[in-house]
């Protein structure tokens, strides 16, 4: 004979609405009440095809920001695989652009967020992420942020500037996103490390904040060319591809008329025409730092978090999109 929800409610001594909330996992139900409902279901032999038992494995959100860079996707993929190898369930909601996917993951039981964004997200679950080396972190109200690794953007900028200065460039511009913590930190380090910072020039004129898009890069590089820049550092891959296209459309050549340095390497950078000089990131090192911090935060590993997170300095990968400045 088929067991009904009314019978379950009667056996547990609760309302039908309470039984529905327990089955649908909606709304607040006291743990003791939930236990009584589950016990009544077991005693009566109630079951249905959509009734899922609690998974013994924990759920972790591994997230890149919306419209991510190649290095961010690579790191997230490595982290997700490693966590699955440790018998954790993984979901991949995007963060920053839309809070709903992450909130859905949290409501589904995610116990931690691992992300390659540098923006503080103020989540109600532990957020394991990357930060800029010299950034002052604002601790979230719940105290849930774990900085697993730091990027030495200042050192990366210095490396790019040293490379460009060595081949005669002084008027160096920056193309960056018009929003986001990474753009903020890149601008700050650009102004602090620029070789012309003590010459009384307005370096803001050599910064172009544009959307993270192909068209944004095309527009920005021509604006900086008109501002007499001879070289540019570009934040995103889309902007870099757009910058190369914009220069070609004006019948200018890279690197003869403009040297270009990208931020973050990817397989396509070898085929950008000319192959792009970039500041490459240690994908393996960043991945391992995030994996270790996650396992320690979830107490799967007992080695403990390092007192100082590891620091990763971008390294220059010199190709043919940079050359000596024209005299």
Regions found by a protein language model. Give the residues of each.
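Periplasmic-binding protein-like
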Residues: 61, 106-117, 171-176, 207, ...
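An alpha-beta-alpha
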Residues: 158-199, 304-322
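Hydrophobic alpha-helical segments within soluble ligand-binding/sensing domains
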Residues: 134-137, 142-174, 184, 214-222, ...
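Flexible loop/turn connectors
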Residues: 223-327
């Amino acid at each position: 004979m088929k067991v009904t929800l009314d019978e379950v409610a009667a056996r547990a001594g609760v309302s039908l609405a309470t039984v529905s909330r327990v089955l649908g996992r909606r709304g607040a139900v006291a743990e003791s009440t939930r236990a009584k409902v589950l016990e009544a279901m077991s005693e009566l032999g109630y079951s249905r095809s959509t009734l899922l038992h609690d998974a013994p494995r924990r759920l972790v959100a591994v997230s890149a920001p919306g419209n991510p860079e190649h290095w961010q996707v690579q790191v997230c993929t490595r982290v997700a695989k490693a966590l699955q190898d440790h018998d954790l369930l993984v979901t991949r909601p995007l963060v920053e652009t839309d809070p709903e996917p992450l909130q859905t993951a949290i409501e589904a039981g995610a116990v931690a967020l691992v992300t390659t964004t540098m923006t503080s997200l103020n989540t109600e679950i532990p957020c394991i992420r990357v930060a800029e080396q010299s950034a002052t972190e604002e601790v979230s109200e719940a105290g849930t942020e774990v900085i697993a690794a730091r990027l030495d953007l200042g050192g990366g900028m210095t490396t790019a500037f040293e490379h460009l200065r060595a081949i005669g460039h002084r008027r160096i511009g920056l193309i960056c996103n018009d929003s986001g913590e990474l753009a903020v930190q890149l601008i700050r380090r650009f102004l602090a490390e620029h070789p012309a910072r003590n010459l009384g020039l307005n370096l803001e004129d050599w910064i172009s904040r544009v959307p993270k898009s192909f068209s944004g890069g095309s527009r920005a590089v021509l604006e900086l060319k008109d501002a007499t820049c001879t070289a540019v550092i570009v934040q995103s891959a889309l902007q870099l591809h757009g910058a190369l296209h914009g220069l070609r459309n004006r019948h200018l050549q890279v690197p003869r008329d403009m040297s270009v340095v990208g931020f973050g390497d990817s397989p396509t950078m070898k085929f950008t025409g000319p192959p792009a000089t970039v500041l490459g990131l240690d994908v393996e090192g960043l991945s391992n730092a995030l994996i270790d911090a996650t396992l320690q935060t979830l107490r799967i590993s007992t080695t403990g978090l390092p007192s100082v997170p590891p620091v990763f300095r971008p390294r220059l990968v010199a190709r043919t999109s940079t050359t000596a400045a024209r005299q």
